[in-house]
Curated annotation (Swiss-Prot):
Positions of short motif Cx9C motif 1: 183-193
GO biological process: cristae formation; inner mitochondrial membrane organization; mitochondrial fusion
Record-linked InterPro entries: MIC19/MIC25 (IPR007964), MICOS_subunit_Mic19 (IPR052632)
Record PTM Phosphotyrosine, positions in chain: 49
Protein name listed in UniProt: MICOS complex subunit MIC19
Residues carrying N6-acetyllysine: 142
Assembly mode: Component of the mitochondrial contact site and cristae organizing system (MICOS) complex, composed of at least MICOS10/MIC10, CHCHD3/MIC19, CHCHD6/MIC25, APOOL/MIC27, IMMT/MIC60, APOO/MIC23/MIC26 and MICOS13/MIC13. This complex was also known under the names MINOS or MitOS complex. The MICOS complex associates with mitochondrial outer membrane proteins SAMM50, MTX1 and MTX2 (together described as components of the mitochondrial outer membrane sorting assembly machinery (SAM) complex) and DNAJC11, mitochondrial inner membrane protein TMEM11 and with HSPA9. (Microbial infection) Interacts with human cytomegalovirus protein UL13; this interaction alters cristae architecture.
Function recorded in the entry: Component of the MICOS complex, a large protein complex of the mitochondrial inner membrane that plays crucial roles in the maintenance of crista junctions, inner membrane architecture, and formation of contact sites to the outer membrane. Plays an important role in the maintenance of the MICOS complex stability and the mitochondrial cristae morphology. Has also been shown to function as a transcription factor which binds to the BAG1 promoter and represses BAG1 transcription.
Positions where lipid (N-myristoyl glycine) attaches: 2
Region (Disordered): 34-61, 73-92
Organism ancestry: Eukaryota, Metazoa, Chordata, Craniata, Vertebrata
Length: 227
């Protein structure tokens, strides 16, 4: 003990699966072992046999180096953990932003779709209303046309009947006053006598007297019938 420094032979055994070394129950990585080898005094020697490493260092020095290397490894691990945590947070933020953008895009698309559907429904209702109004107007016009045709037919019938009745009345009226030549035979004889005796009309005086008597008799007969 005293001022002498005790030394012990420490064996570093390699782990085939995890590429680390066990030092008295402490698992060290190859990076730690390499740094320990590089920082060891020039008087220390390393030995290699069957994949194992040997090093002669003091117990205190070994503990110090192991503690330092473990602290470095821990700091490195914490730094890497912080980096991974930062990257994870950044990834989460990016994912959240992407999800928000996607949600907004879906919402905008949904709103646009709903607006388009609303416009389509409104247009359909307008077309239905216009079609209903047109059908109503068409039915009204057809009804009015039918009434006009009926009125025209009735007017034609009444007009025809009235015309026929008026024609019959006029015809009956004129038939009632229909006249025939009076004393037609004597009138013809007088005309013939006047043509034959142009310069001797007195020869026709006897026929003229008979014609006048015939006319007067006819007038008297008509007056008697009318009275």
């Amino acid at each position: 003990m005293g001022g002498t420094t005790s030394t012990r032979r420490v064996t570093f055994e390699a782990d085939e699966n995890e590429n680390i070394t066990v030092v008295k129950g402490i698992r060290l990585s190859e990076n730690v072992i390499d740094r320990m080898k590089e920082s060891s005094p020039s008087g220390s020697k390393s030995q290699r046999y069957s994949g194992a490493y040997g090093a002669s260092v003091s117990d205190e020095e070994l503990k110090r180096r192991v503690a330092e290397e473990l602290a470095l490894e821990q700091a490195k691990k914490e730094s890497e953990d912080q980096k991974r945590l930062k990257q994870a947070k950044e990834l989460d933020r990016e994912r959240a932003a992407a999800n928000e953008q996607l949600t907004r895009a879906i919402l905008r698309e949904r709103i646009c779709s709903e607006e388009e559907r609303a416009k389509a429904k409104h247009l359909a209702r307008q077309l239905e209303e216009k079609d209903r109004v047109l059908k109503k107007q068409d039915a009204f016009y057809k009804e009015q046309l039918a009434r006009l045709e009926e009125r025209s037919s009735e007017f034609y019938r009444v007009t025809t009947e009235q015309y026929q009745k008026a024609a019959e009345e006029v015809e009956a009226k004129f038939k009632r006053y229909e006249s025939h030549p009076v004393c037609a035979d004597l009138q013809a004889k007088i005309l013939q006598c006047y043509r034959e005796n142009t310069h001797q009309t007195l020869k026709c005086s006897a026929l003229a007297t008979q014609y006048m008597h015939c006319v007067n008799h006819a007038k008297q007969s008509m007056l008697e019938k009318g009275g």
